[in-house]
């Protein structure tokens, strides 16, 4: 699936939905390794951005997104609309990230 065909909106200008295939999702659970936890702990004493956790969150979001798009491919979708992310702390330093949306088949609108 072309990542350009994913959107947080529920419509795509110049296209119309031919079929709605249902909800697709990607879920991952991440935990920072001990070295990152220690470095982040020291960095948090000074305040500001904690790069170790930012990197972990970005990797988790990217992985959840990739799993979601693979799920949409399996269903035969060529687009995903209404893409959203959510995160839940499962335990200390362990976070679940989910990416979800509506798998659809879209076609370009006919030119007038």
PLM region spans:
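Surface-exposed short loop/turn segments
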Residues: 74-107
């Amino acid at each position: 699936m072309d990542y350009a065909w994913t959107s947080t909106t529920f419509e795509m200008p110049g296209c119309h939905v031919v079929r709605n295939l249902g909800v697709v999702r990607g879920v991952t659970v991440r935990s920072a390794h001990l070295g990152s936890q220690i470095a982040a702990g020291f960095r948090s004493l000074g305040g500001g951005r904690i790069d170790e956790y930012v990197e972990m969150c970005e990797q988790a979001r990217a992985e959840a997104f990739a799993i979601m798009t693979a799920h949409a491919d399996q269903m035969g979708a060529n687009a995903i609309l209404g893409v959203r992310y959510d995160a839940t702390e499962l335990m200390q330093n362990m976070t679940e990230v989910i990416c979800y949306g509506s798998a659809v088949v879209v076609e370009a609108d006919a030119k007038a």
